[in-house]
Amino acid sequence: MNYMTITAHKLKDMIKNREISVEEIARTYLDRVDEVDGKLGAYLYVASEGLLQKAKELDKKISRGEILGKLFGIPISVKDNISVENMQNTCASRMLTGYISPYDAHVVEKIKFHQGIIIGKTNMDEFAMGSSTENSSIKLSRNPWDLNRVPGGSSGGSAISVAAGEAALSIGTDTGGSIRQPASFCGVVGLKPTYGRISRYGAVAFGSTLDQIGTIAADVEDCALLTECISGMDKRDFTTADMEVPKYSKSLSKDIKGMRIGIPKEYFGEGLNDKVRKSVEEAILVLKENGAQIKECSIPLSEYALAAYYIIASAEASSNLARFDGIRYGYRSKNFKDAVDIYFKSRSEGLGSEVKRRIVLGTYVLSEGYYDDYYKKALKVRKLIRNQFEDIMKEFHAIISPTCPTTAFKIDEKKEDVMAMYLSDIYTVPANITGIPAISIPCGMVDGLPVGLQIMSGYFRENILFNVAYSFEQSTKWHSITPDIQKEDRNYGI
């Protein structure tokens, strides 16, 4: 079985037709992890025994002629900030080393209901704070297209696992681009749905008004399938919408004739790599040839989204991460004098530099004397940006931009330049600020590295995203190109 090119929906058909057993699929993916993950570092934990046991149980269901779930027998990886019962949930942080989740997140419950199987937990930036997965306190992850480069972040391990054939599908979280940016860097499809489309129950909170669980897949149909399976209302997350979930994977169409697509000029200005710009412009021409009506538009306030985002996200992080105090659970310093010292030293030793930087920033902007000048103004800017996006979505079915201003950058290239790292999210954070859905799909290659095309639409219009993405995908070959991980001519220092 060619794990690099076969899709989840094709795998399910093969299982249904008894061309392959679930156990064979599980063993093939485990062999793939053994083969390449020592180089890539996608996984923090692989549930080998549990995967094989579940696979055997599912094979028995087939032999009994039982009805198969939508994700029957499909190996799925899960970012290590989403709870899976009896598996670790470390957020790639020393603070949570050894923590085992006693329950399933809502999305994991849904995966199990549809009979998908969890292969393991993937690496990430610590507490989802980062854009390269370099902030993991546990291990370094590498881009499967070039082992000297980052996979993006914070859901870097999830993107790697799909791009490298180590999982058929993956679940991640997106607070400012953490699914779409690594999807772009690794050449896969990544969706951040509308805020409230998918329950966040069981996901460790970073920025509660920004966080959203989303999906990563090798192609649009797989992404649509996983999204429809895990979406829906959850009473344990009051932000979820009580709305019917469309059958996204069954309504895909290449026909986008007459669809109005806007091209915001602010996304094509200074800072965008010329070769990336060319790839995105060529992608826009494909959509035009497929019948879409293309028109330039303007969202002038979008340039303030990044600044507003980092103020709001840091403020929410400083509140959410206060629970990690070395007393209730998690890492506890052994060198302390009293209760206050436990708190101070446990957080100082257990949290990484980027996490501490954002906690300090968040505490600062929420403090007396600065609340009005920073946090309150950021909330006002957020509202104005949201209003502009809502207005633009009345005119267009979708708007298109690059996912990132560059392709994947080299390991350590931006680690010490915080602002340069933050700017890699400049095109993705507006979707989180506003809550609209956005998807990244492969649209080209630049110097051997994937380029991502970002498509955004109005609230709960994921079906439009999937159709525009599917139309482009069916007219091009970019989604079918896979990395050659076995090349040995690269000095990647392992």
From Swiss-Prot:
GO terms for cellular component: glutamyl-tRNA(Gln) amidotransferase complex. The keyword Ion transport does not apply. The active site is at 79 (charge relay system), 154 (charge relay system), 178 (acyl-ester intermediate). It is an enzyme of class 6 (ligase). Allows the formation of correctly charged Gln-tRNA(Gln) through the transamidation of misacylated Glu-tRNA(Gln) in organisms which lack glutaminyl-tRNA synthetase. The reaction takes place in the presence of glutamine and ATP through an activated gamma-phospho-Glu-tRNA(Gln). PANTHER family: GLUTAMYL-TRNA(GLN) AMIDOTRANSFERASE SUBUNIT A, TRANSAMIDASE. This is Glutamyl-tRNA(Gln) amidotransferase subunit A. It comes from Clostridium kluyveri (strain NBRC 12016).
